[in-house]
A protein has these predicted regions:
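C-terminal substrate/ligand-recognition segments
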Residues: 289, 293
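Beta-rich carbohydrate-recognition and catalytic domains
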Residues: 1-107, 115-215, 224-284, 295-299, ...
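Catalytic core of Fe(II)/2-oxoglutarate
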Residues: 221
Length: 341
């Protein structure tokens, strides 16, 4: 097994559980045995939490959580944790303000990501802007969130910011789509000098001939910088006679030009099979949104939404997952910037 390095701050208190001796899954990812870590009715007025993002913060952990309110409208709530497993969810929605400090609340907000770039945290979510569109807010303290310009025109979802600038620019993945439930979708990458004006749009990768991701794909957790490239966990969707099935996939993008796919795993890494993934408000969903990872040990904790009803936690080791992706890689001519390599 090759030695792979991770370039990020160490997180010695990363949540962790060793792989069970009786785990026979092909991919080196295993579920936390006490899943789901967040169940139904986790806070007053919130029926379900799922598809949420978490980060280390001042020795503890903070997250932005998609909460389905009891009126059915999704919004984003803050949560705090000592161990990144047991979460205290605020009963109050995040209060967004504009750059003048005036309240500026989206009509609804869902599927957030949370990424630190330099000394600023960026929350990214899907909202209504004449249809499904990307919203962004910045924060220094994870208490006050200042909204900034929407990066793209509608319709777009699944925006994921890279954790550092590349060649002096912010870099973000997104998935252009329609305003409905989107029976299509490829991952694109865009650049910005200031988080306001976005351009240099490039195609990264699309759906594949593998059945588990034959309908559409979308970005998941923020990419992890490694010596092999950017490690990306994403979701792939298949269509069945019983509806969509969302699984977790893995790819490695070029470190300097992330529109280039170096490796893309032909197999899913995690697919619905536990009760909390197969049964829920939207059945058969594993939807990755965040990782907590420790550069010293190579431990990676993956947070994913389960059946649009719960939050699940899974684990892997950097060396093992990179080796698995590389040894099961199929990169097609439809992947990368302009459809050829």
């Amino acid at each position: 097994m090759s030695e792979v390095k991770m370039f990020s701050e160490p997180v010695p208190n990363v949540p962790w559980q060793d792989r069970p001796a009786n785990d026979n899954h092909d991919a080196p990812i295993w579920r936390y045995t006490e899943n789901p870590i967040i169940g139904r009715n986790p806070a007053k007025g919130v029926a379900r939490i799922f598809n949420s993002a978490v980060v280390p913060f001042e020795g503890k952990f903070v997250g932005v959580f998609r909460g389905e309110q009891v009126n059915g409208i999704p919004y984003i709530y803050l949560g705090e944790s000592e161990d990144a497993i047991h979460w205290n969810i605020s009963e109050e929605k995040i209060k967004f303000v504009d750059e003048n400090g005036e309240e500026f609340m989206p009509i609804y907000a869902y599927d957030p990501r949370l990424v630190k770039v330099e000394d600023t945290y960026y929350a990214i979510w899907c909202q209504d802007f004449y249809g499904a569109a990307i919203g962004i807010a910045k924060s220094k303290d994870l208490k006050t969130f200042v909204r900034i310009e929407n990066p793209f025109l509608p319709f777009n979802r699944n925006a994921v910011l890279f954790p550092r600038k590349i060649s002096g620019n912010f870099v973000m993945l997104s998935r252009p789509s329609d305003s409905g439930h989107t029976p299509f979708g490829d991952i694109f990458v865009s650049e910005s000098p200031d988080m306001v004006y976005w351009g240099k749009h490039r195609h990264v990768m699309g759906k594949s001939s593998e059945w588990w991701e034959s309908l559409k794909i979308g970005g998941g957790a923020a990419p992890i910088e490694t010596s092999e490239g950017w490690l990306l966990f994403y979701h792939g969707v298949s269509g069945t006679c019983n509806g969509y099935v969302y699984s977790i996939g893995g790819a490695i993008l070029d470190i300097d030009n992330p529109s280039i796919v170096k490796y893309r795993c032909e197999n899913f890494l995690l697919t619905p099979e536990e009760w909390y993934e197969e049964r829920g408000f939207v059945p058969n969903v594993c939807f990755p949104c965040a990782t907590i990872h420790d550069s010293e040990s190579g431990k990676i904790a993956i947070y994913y939404g389960a059946a649009d009803s719960y939050v699940g936690l899974a684990f892997t080791k950097l060396d093992e997952i990179v080796d698995y992706i590389k040894s099961h890689s199929v990169v097609t001519t439809s992947d990368t910037e302009i459809g050829r390599r």
